[in-house]
Amino acid sequence: MRTSQFLLATQKETPSDAVVISHQLMLRAGMIRKLASGLYTWLPMGLRVMRKVEAIVREEMDAAGSLEVLMPSTQPAELWQESGRWEEYGPELLRIKDRHGRDFCAGPTHEEVITDLMRNELSSYKQLPINLYQIQTKFRDEIRPRFGLMRGREFIMKDSYSFHADQASLQVTYDRMHDAYCNIFTRLGLKFRPVEADNGSIGGAGSHEFHVLAESGEDDIVFSNGSDYAANIEKAEAVPRETSRAAPSEELRLVDTPDTKTIAALVEKFNLPIEKTIKTLIVHAEEEGKLIALIIRGDHELNEIKAANQPGVASPLVMASDAELRDAIGAGAGSLGPLNLPLPIIIDRSVELMSDFAIGANIDDKHYFGVNWERDLPVPTVADLRNVVAGDPSPDGKGTLEIKRGIEVGHIFQLGNKYSKAMKCEVLGENGKPVTLEMGCYGIGVSRVVAAAIEQNNDENGIIWSDALAPFQIALVPLRYETELVREATDKLYAELTAAGFEVLLDDRDKKTSPGIKFADMELIGIPHRIVVSDRGLAEGNLEYKSRTEGQAQALPVADVLSFLQARIRR
């Protein structure tokens, strides 16, 4: 491809509304253009990259035994009402009406559509298992679209769905898809981690997320430095560093604590170790009008997913208002504690191992110091309620936990029969009786992968693409292309490289475009390999080669360029 025949839409300046580096570089490199909030047009440069992602995804899905289909992006409300998600999904579901007043939605996901399809196509266990996938545009009406393609409203996604007669069959396919996802992200040249995850609104049992490691990531991912244990922050099990509770060494005493509504104020005023304090958080119970107390250590953060999964706790988690606290307890949020608290109590594992600690007295501006379990109050229900912190023991007993930032680019779920049961997706089993199918679903944010790859691979000059993702593998940059010697050598090499199967961008812009601008554009776009043709180099029988990831250029004999690139570029 010659630049004279291509839409080369690079920009020198960074748009003011682009915050994250992937958004900035995709705009500057001429990959995308904004149409409206959360909506982007893919220009030829960007689309070439996305097609590379799609091709690798298709190859690995096909190899894993998944069959490609294409479902409508507009979905009838009846299916979502049947599954129960029409109201559950919330305002992110864009609801529309046709001219006849019938309700539809712009599909954010396709569990209902695929389940409806399969209940009409499958009749016998002999047709199972089956795994279907599509690559298609989705729409989620994000309240605040931001970060370019990282959190847009319209995006490209690969979603696949599998159907099984039993859990054992589902597990086999789930493991196969897990491996396929690892293959995909490895082939894309990304540093990534699969982590255990919570199923969220999709429902079902087990799930894993796939995160591209990047400091700009929105998610915390947790992994052991001594094993392959990994989970997202919502799912990671918090194991106390302490193994036993120390014996009491202080007497219980009631202390006046004016102007200490926060843990930080209490610690500073009374010179307490923060590890000797607790947070008492009051939340709504499942039973209407009831409240439950959740208690974590003062230096820990409540994990709202874990908390909402506790028996009796309302989901999603709802904190009690100040009026509710005063009505039920008689004190405000800064003075609460478990002693004489007239509510059910759940404490974190770390709290169970505390001794001589400070708690609110359930009286404004008063705390108890020197509190000890069993001596002063019984140990209530104990559960894992907090977020892990770096240095916690790994739940598998091997090593300690580290935390890094990640960008979620894939998610696989074992759905169980959540949708198939609600929508009566059944086949006749081996014994001739109806069997409700077990389902799995598996998603990759194809357009998000492009942005995530840039977040992970960039420098001050622009994008750094892997050979697998680059829009072009080679930038061929002639200096003084208007001269016969340079033009003939450039055209000859261009023909040889393209005939050998390389994707080459020949920068044939005229002399009004300086060499510096040409080099800067190729680095901004992120083309991995650059060949410079100049009359000076040709006079010595050489061309100049430079890798996007290496600082120094090197001279190559003209006759050796093709073999050098064939050995260098991962095909």
UniProtKB/Swiss-Prot annotation:
Q: Name one Pfam family in it.
A: tRNA-synt_2b
Q: Where are the transmembrane segments?
A: none
- Record's signal peptide: none
Catalyzed reaction equations: tRNA(Pro) + L-proline + ATP = L-prolyl-tRNA(Pro) + AMP + diphosphate
Q: Does the keyword ATP-binding apply?
A: yes
Location(s) in or outside the cell: Cytoplasm
What Gene3D superfamilies does this protein's entry cite?
Anticodon-binding domain (3.40.50.800), Bira Bifunctional Protein, Domain 2 (3.30.930.10), YbaK/aminoacyl-tRNA synthetase-associated domain (3.90.960.10)
User: What does the entry's domain section say?
Assistant: Consists of three domains: the N-terminal catalytic domain, the editing domain and the C-terminal anticodon-binding domain.
NCBIfam families according to UniProt: PRK09194.1, proS_fam_II
The UniProt similarity line reads:
Belongs to the class-II aminoacyl-tRNA synthetase family. ProS type 1 subfamily.
What is known about its subunit structure?
Homodimer.
| Summary of the function given for this chain in its UniProt record | Catalyzes the attachment of proline to tRNA(Pro) in a two-step reaction: proline is first activated by ATP to form Pro-AMP and then transferred to the acceptor end of tRNA(Pro). As ProRS can inadvertently accommodate and process non-cognate amino acids such as alanine and cysteine, to avoid such errors it has two additional distinct editing activities against alanine. One activity is designated as 'pretransfer' editing and involves the tRNA(Pro)-independent hydrolysis of activated Ala-AMP.
Q: What is the name of the protein in this document? A: Proline--tRNA ligase
Give me the gene this protein comes from.
Answer: proS
